[in-house]
Amino acid sequence: MNAAVRPVSADTAIADISLAAWGRKEILIAETEMPGLMATREEFAAAQPLKGARIAGSLHMTIQTAVLIETLKALGAEVRWASCNIFSTQDHAAAAIAETGTPVFAIKGESLADYWDYTHRIFEFGAAGTEGEGPNMILDDGGDATMLLHLGMRAEKDLSVLDNPASEEEKIAFAAIRAKLAQDPTWYTRKSAHIIGVTEETTTGVHRLNEMSAKGTLKFRAINVNDSVTKSKFDNLYGCRESLVDGIKRATDVMIAGKVAVVAGYGDVGKGCAQALRALSAQVWVTEIDPINALQAAMEGYKVVTMEWAADKADIFVTTTGNRDIIRHEHMVAMKNEAIVCNIGHFDNEIDVASIEQYQWEEIKPQVDHITFPDGKKIILLAKGRLVNLGCATGHPSFVMSASFANQTIAQIELFTKPDAYEVGKVYVLPKILDEKVARLHLKKVGAMLTELTDGQAAYIGVSKQGPYKPETYRY
């Protein structure tokens, strides 16, 4: 365990409980910017729809997540929580939640060994062998919690599945699973036994769920929260539009205007990042594999290039794809002196950080590193290739996270209260009427007035006056 840890109880791992008062003040401010979550509390508090839910949460332990946790608890749930990224925790947020008695396992800058230990600990509900052992719900971001249980169950039957880790992180994760099985050979099966389902926050985690579902190996019901319109078209786009440059600026104090910035990927995240950089008068180039997205970027006025072409010309590089090996060793070797390299995709494999570990590293400040190449050229790597907006800043603004987390809360209620409506092993999205509900909850805060259809108008286009207003195939 990190030497800096001063836990409030044996069932908690945080940096410093004395930060709780600061965290509580920021939580109160965030609540005023999170109308969706607060309205959900008000609507469901009396009914307690999550009473009896034991939620294992793996999601960035930020101030905004603290509001989510307290919403889940207000609706009756019991919660255990860890961060889904070693750099994304806000220690004062973790302290504020720990002070309320919720088990929290999250420290900014925790080691990978601690990360996997903490992820194991979110499943430790109840006494062994009882009906209350383990969680009955998972709230995941990136899929690590879900993956851990599935891989652990496979390893119970065949340890050889842990024989060939593909990365340093997998090596540490696999070692943690081996150690757990040496202590308790049926731990993963027991912790999974009562799980009704999982709600997944982000693109990368949804990809993992879809892969398992297609192979027939997904053991739980799942709701894909990421593809709710009020998540992907808001958090991914508008959230990244504000938090990317916040991270770059806090880390480097660089002037964006006049720089050439490359955004790898032009999905919702890439679109938001490109808009932000252009708004600060950078010259923005985009790399893409998909001709539709590439054409979208070109029609918005961005120059569409390849990373090979751009590597020696640009000043700032941002990966947004959710894929691996986007910026490789040969790209970094070609870069200008003092080029800034960062990632805003969920995992750290978009930039081949392992390939430059052989060179000289100098930490400028936490999550900001100078890497010196053999020819003396230096690049600036942010957050060691992990999420720059959470590693070097504090993530998305509260308002946009209110929409994402209202979706999470509604998805948890859906799965927990209506399990028979969802088939084990399949991945679902929330009904459009609930997506529209989340949007409605946020309109007043931004001063928006919604026009109401007349009976004749509703009949003419064949929709209910209460919605949903668009077919499932509609792309916003």
UniProtKB/Swiss-Prot annotation:
<dbReference type="GO" id="GO:0071269">
    <property type="term" value="P:L-homocysteine biosynthetic process"/>
</dbReference>
<dbReference type="InterPro" id="IPR000043">
    <property type="entry name" value="Adenosylhomocysteinase-like"/>
</dbReference>
<feature type="binding site">
    <location>
        <position position="201"/>
    </location>
    <ligand>
        <name>substrate</name>
    </ligand>
</feature>
<dbReference type="Pfam" id="PF00670">
    <property type="entry name" value="AdoHcyase_NAD"/>
</dbReference>
<dbReference type="InterPro" id="IPR036291">
    <property type="entry name" value="NAD(P)-bd_dom_sf"/>
</dbReference>
<keyword id="KW-0378">Hydrolase</keyword>
<protein>
    <recommendedName>
        <fullName>Adenosylhomocysteinase</fullName>
        <ecNumber>3.13.2.1</ecNumber>
    </recommendedName>
</protein>
<feature type="binding site">
    <location>
        <position position="231"/>
    </location>
    <ligand>
        <name>substrate</name>
    </ligand>
</feature>
<feature type="binding site">
    <location>
        <position position="389"/>
    </location>
    <ligand>
        <name>NAD(+)</name>
    </ligand>
</feature>
<dbReference type="GO" id="GO:0033353">
    <property type="term" value="P:S-adenosylmethionine cycle"/>
</dbReference>
<feature type="binding site">
    <location>
        <position position="236"/>
    </location>
    <ligand>
        <name>NAD(+)</name>
    </ligand>
</feature>
<feature type="binding site">
    <location>
        <position position="288"/>
    </location>
    <ligand>
        <name>NAD(+)</name>
    </ligand>
</feature>
<keyword id="KW-0520">NAD</keyword>
<comment type="pathway">
    <text>Amino-acid biosynthesis; L-homocysteine biosynthesis; L-homocysteine from S-adenosyl-L-homocysteine: step 1/1.</text>
</comment>
<feature type="binding site">
    <location>
        <position position="323"/>
    </location>
    <ligand>
        <name>NAD(+)</name>
    </ligand>
</feature>
<feature type="binding site">
    <location>
        <begin position="202"/>
        <end position="204"/>
    </location>
    <ligand>
        <name>NAD(+)</name>
    </ligand>
</feature>
<feature type="binding site">
    <location>
        <position position="141"/>
    </location>
    <ligand>
        <name>substrate</name>
    </ligand>
</feature>
<feature type="binding site">
    <location>
        <begin position="344"/>
        <end position="346"/>
    </location>
    <ligand>
        <name>NAD(+)</name>
    </ligand>
</feature>
<dbReference type="GO" id="GO:0004013">
    <property type="term" value="F:adenosylhomocysteinase activity"/>
</dbReference>
<feature type="binding site">
    <location>
        <position position="62"/>
    </location>
    <ligand>
        <name>substrate</name>
    </ligand>
</feature>
<dbReference type="GO" id="GO:0005829">
    <property type="term" value="C:cytosol"/>
</dbReference>
<comment type="function">
    <text>May play a key role in the regulation of the intracellular concentration of adenosylhomocysteine.</text>
</comment>
<dbReference type="InterPro" id="IPR042172">
    <property type="entry name" value="Adenosylhomocyst_ase-like_sf"/>
</dbReference>
<feature type="binding site">
    <location>
        <position position="235"/>
    </location>
    <ligand>
        <name>substrate</name>
    </ligand>
</feature>
<dbReference type="InterPro" id="IPR020082">
    <property type="entry name" value="S-Ado-L-homoCys_hydrolase_CS"/>
</dbReference>
<dbReference type="Pfam" id="PF05221">
    <property type="entry name" value="AdoHcyase"/>
</dbReference>
<keyword id="KW-0554">One-carbon metabolism</keyword>
<comment type="similarity">
    <text>Belongs to the adenosylhomocysteinase family.</text>
</comment>
<feature type="binding site">
    <location>
        <begin position="265"/>
        <end position="270"/>
    </location>
    <ligand>
        <name>NAD(+)</name>
    </ligand>
</feature>
<keyword id="KW-0963">Cytoplasm</keyword>
<dbReference type="InterPro" id="IPR015878">
    <property type="entry name" value="Ado_hCys_hydrolase_NAD-bd"/>
</dbReference>
<dbReference type="GO" id="GO:0006730">
    <property type="term" value="P:one-carbon metabolic process"/>
</dbReference>
